[in-house]
């Protein structure tokens, strides 16, 4: 296993095949006047530079320091995220799952790769692998171990299956020793993987 891609697997098509298919579809849409190349470039720039797990990290940091916001986030995640200017396509209906000392939540999309884009950006390749989609349900502790996290035996692992209608993400536990951290410092500890639930935030000593 590698640090960058703990879950091994492949997609039904190679990256080269997928890229070629996307380019062909773009060309058809542009030729038919359904979309412009400028619009495609703009959307690519947004998801590469403006949308990503850094937004989810800021929301988590706010929840860690503001109990009232945390309650709103757990009650109506979509609305609470909008308070911080986060929302939109692929995040119309979101639910946030709180990790505790006795429960660890982990998110998967067993059907395809449904994912809360406004909060986490584009999904990593491993999230789309059939191996992850199957093993997250069948052997969640084994998958977590491959990501370097081993919950205590008495911690309940809950698996949540995202769909096109409802997308889940995780509110991790706040690391110990961060009582005097600012929101910005706390956000730096939150990783994409911890928001999916396959890992936990970075500890202050490792940040």
Swiss-Prot record:
It holds the Pfam family NHase_alpha. Keywords: Cobalt, Lyase, Metal-binding. NHase catalyzes the hydration of various nitrile compounds to the corresponding amides. Binds 1 Co(3+) ion per subunit. This is Low-molecular weight cobalt-containing nitrile hydratase subunit alpha. It is an enzyme of class 4 (lyase). Signal peptide: none annotated. Industrial production of acrylamide is now being developed using some of these enzymes. SUPFAM superfamilies: Nitrile hydratase alpha chain. It comes from Rhodococcus rhodochrous. It catalyses: an aliphatic primary amide = an aliphatic nitrile + H2O.
């Amino acid at each position: 296993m590698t640090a960058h891609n703990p879950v091994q697997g492949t997609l039904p098509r190679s990256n080269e095949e997928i890229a070629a298919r996307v380019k062909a579809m773009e060309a058809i849409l542009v030729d038919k006047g359904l979309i412009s190349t400028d619009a495609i470039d703009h959307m690519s720039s947004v998801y590469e530079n403006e949308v990503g797990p850094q937004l989810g990290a800021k929301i988590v940091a706010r929840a860690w320091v503001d109990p009232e916001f945390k309650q709103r986030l757990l009650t109506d995640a979509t609305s609470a995220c909008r308070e911080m200017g986060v929302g939109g396509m692929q995040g119309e209906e979101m639910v946030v799952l709180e990790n505790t000392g006795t429960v660890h939540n982990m998110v998967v999309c067993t059907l395809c790769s449904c994912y809360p884009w406004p909060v986490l950006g584009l999904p990593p390749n491993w999230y789309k692998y059939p191996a992850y989609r199957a093993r997250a349900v069948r052997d969640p502790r084994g998958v977590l171990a491959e990501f370097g996290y081993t919950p205590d035996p008495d911690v309940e692992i809950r698996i949540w299956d995202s769909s096109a209608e409802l997308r889940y993400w995780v509110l991790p536990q706040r690391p110990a020793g961060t009582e005097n951290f600012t929101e910005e410092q706390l956000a730096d500890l939150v990783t994409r993987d911890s928001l999916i639930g396959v890992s936990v935030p970075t500890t202050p000593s490792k940040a």
